[in-house]
Amino acid sequence: MSEKLKIVYRPLQELSPYAHNARTHSTEQVAQLVESIKQFGWTNPVLIDEKGEIIAGHGRVMAAEMLKMDSVPVIVLSGLTDEQKQR
C-alpha cells in the first residue's frame, strides 16, 4: 500500500529556496498571491524536500513572508533527484 500525501505546517524559517529554481516572480505576481491568500486562504500547499528546500511554491512563500505568517502548509516529498526537482 502506498503512503498518502500529508499536509503539515512548517515554520517559514525552516524553508529554503531551491538554488536552481528557474521560475521568478514579479512584484505584481506576489501581490496577487498575497490577495489570494487573504481572500481564499491556502488552497495549494508548498512542496518541499526532506531538508526543507522548496521545490514548488517559492511565490507562495514570498507572499506568506509579506503577510508576516509564521508557518505555511507543506507537503514533504522524499527521494527526489535534482532533475526531478527542476521540473
Curated annotation (Swiss-Prot):
Protein name (record): ParB-like nuclease domain-containing protein YnaK
Family matches, as Pfam families: ParBc
InterPro entries linked: Chromosome_partition/occlusion, ParB/Sulfiredoxin_dom, ParB/Sulfiredoxin_sf
PANTHER family, per database record: CHROMOSOME-PARTITIONING PROTEIN PARB-RELATED
Note: Encoded in the Rac prophage region.
SUPFAM superfamilies: ParB/Sulfiredoxin (SSF110849)
Gene from which this protein is expressed: ynaK
Organism: Escherichia coli (strain K12)
